[in-house]
Amino acid sequence: MIQELIRERFGVLYSVKYLSELLKNMGFSYQKARFAVGGDDPETAEKRRHWLEVTWPRILAQAQRQNAYLLFGHEVSFPQWGSLTYTWAKRGEQPTVKTSGKRKGYKVFGLIDYFTGRFFHKGLEERLNSKTYIAFLTQVLASTRKPIILVQDGAPYHTSKALQKFFAAHARRLTVHQLPAYSPDYNPIEKLWKKIKERDIHLHYFPTFDDLKVKVEKALSRFARLRKEVLPLFSFFRESEMKLA
């Protein structure tokens, strides 16, 4: 791409090898890009700051008063066709990973508790929508008698009319708070999905959908057992509490 840009702009064709050396000498390195949080305008930044410094302490205090689960929720789809990442290989030999080519994913709803690291999850083959989200939350409510404070993002079906009706019907035990827009970094369960992808999905071959499903369910069960691996995912909030103290 850089070679083509130079050719188009300056009419000079450099070899790829020379360009690599030139870029290294200029202080560049070949890196994998990462996603950055969007919405960095002043208004969005102020809403994020207010949520972290004002709203979050109130949510935490409410959960402590009620002895409630403080659950951060999110959903994810793990693709059968697999995913790629960096890995070590001999120079000149690009590694390859088999793929089924099947454009199908195993979906998972998840909630993790701030205080205990408890992990609630439900895998499904259906679509992620209001109906399946309500079924998951109903299952969670049935599994405990404790009050629940739910922190969720702004996915459209999280705030649909069906969900609003569901939340109202369970208001005695279930309190819902919305994360600010453009704030995946405020949702610790995103890190859990990343860990599962890194350990169990990247560079793996899933010839059948059941192979994927079994692999994902084993990973989910592992985190459900090992709460000590879930609790560190909340380090961002614990550090922010220390700064605000």
What are these regions (language model features)?
Residues Q66-L70, E190-A245:
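C-terminal anion-handling pockets and recognition modules
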Residues I2, L19, H74, G110-L111, ...:
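Mobile genetic element proteins and their domesticated derivatives, centered on retroelements
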Residues Q94-G101, A168-P188, Y205:
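RNase H-like polynucleotidyl transferase catalytic core
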Residues G39, D153-G154, K161, H177-R199, ...:
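RNase H-like two-metal-ion nuclease catalytic core shared by retroviral integrases
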Residues F10, R48-T138, F237-L244:
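Extended, low-complexity cationic-aromatic segments
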Residues W81, S130-Q178:
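RNase H-like DDE/DDD metal-dependent nuclease/strand-transfer catalytic core used by mobile genetic elements
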Residues M26-S29, E75-P79, Y114-G117, A155-H158, ...:
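Short, solvent-exposed loop/turn segments at secondary-structure junctions
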Residues M1-D41, Y69, V76-F78:
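Conserved short alpha-helical interface segments
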